[in-house]
Amino acid sequence: MAVVTMKQLLDSGTHFGHQTRRWNPKMKRFIFTDRNGIYIIDLQQTLTFIDKAYEFVKETVAHGGSVLFVGTKKQAQESVAAEATRVGMPYVNQRWLGGMLTNFSTVHKRLQRLKELEAMEQTGGFEGRTKKEILGLTREKNKLERSLGGIRDMAKVPSAIWVVDTNKEHIAVGEARKLGIPVIAILDTNCDPDEVDYPIPGNDDAIRSAALLTRVIASAVAEGLQARAGLGRADGKPEAEAAEPLAEWEQELLASATASATPSATASTTALTDAPAGATEPTTDAS
């Protein structure tokens, strides 16, 4: 059974790239066509790369590895935290602190300090101190919780990282590459595919797209954990969400992708470029 369907990708707007004036030429091979000045990503390739990334994550976790989820842009913060928490993996959805990977020994000391402050607060360790001291300790704890709370249980650098928007998270990607940690990421049309080991061509700006693809990676982690525990294979297919009706041109794209006979690229391109200008518009082109 497919990990995710073409219909789910279309419903979440995964096929919308950036404006044609904002692109990375290295992404040309992942682009199907353009419509109304917006690049349309080839979802057939997206499905293929999702399968590769899914298998890699599943095997990595099954053999004892961990995956760090990274997404600090507003569109990704909620899904990154929710999905990582669901499968017990570390995450960063606030500002990435330089050295989180390359200087992990120092970061680990800060994590120990966070746990120390939490223990003091819970066991009455703040008692007997002045109000000013208590306020200072509380602020320190809250600051550490905000910046490091998602990785509180990360005892060592991860086996791989999942990234939403490699341009925004370029520091995290750079640190992972420096340490030889595999990078799995959504590749929008303005990204550099050379920086990613397991790319998934798609829209990294739409909330639903980022959530769907993050859920796919989390499902791969869950299946890997079950395999590690000897519980057998789980169905990693994400649950379908209520979706808005597809525009006519998107319905044609879905039909051409699911037809028993492979349609010609010319016919598919015509179906897209001839679509009415008032069809479903892409998400805001913001990083």
Curated annotation (Swiss-Prot):
InterPro entries found in the cross-reference section? Ribosomal_uS2, Ribosomal_uS2_bac/mit/plastid, Ribosomal_uS2_CS, Ribosomal_uS2_flav_dom_sf
- Please give the SUPFAM superfamilies that the UniProt record associates with this protein: Ribosomal protein S2
What Pfam family is a match for this entry? Ribosomal_S2
Q: Record's Gene Ontology CC terms?
A: cytosolic small ribosomal subunit; peptidoglycan-based cell wall; plasma membrane
Q: Which Gene Ontology BP annotations are present?
A: translation
Molecular-function annotations in GO: structural constituent of ribosome
| Leader sequence residues | none
User: Which keywords appear in this protein's UniProt record, sorted alphabetically?
Assistant: Ribonucleoprotein, Ribosomal protein
Where are the residues of the annotated region Disordered?
254-287
Q: Where is the composition biased (Low complexity)?
A: 254-277
Please report which protein family the annotation says this sequence is part of: Belongs to the universal ribosomal protein uS2 family.
Q: What is this protein called?
A: Small ribosomal subunit protein uS2
Whose protein is this, by species? Mycobacterium tuberculosis (strain ATCC 25618 / H37Rv)
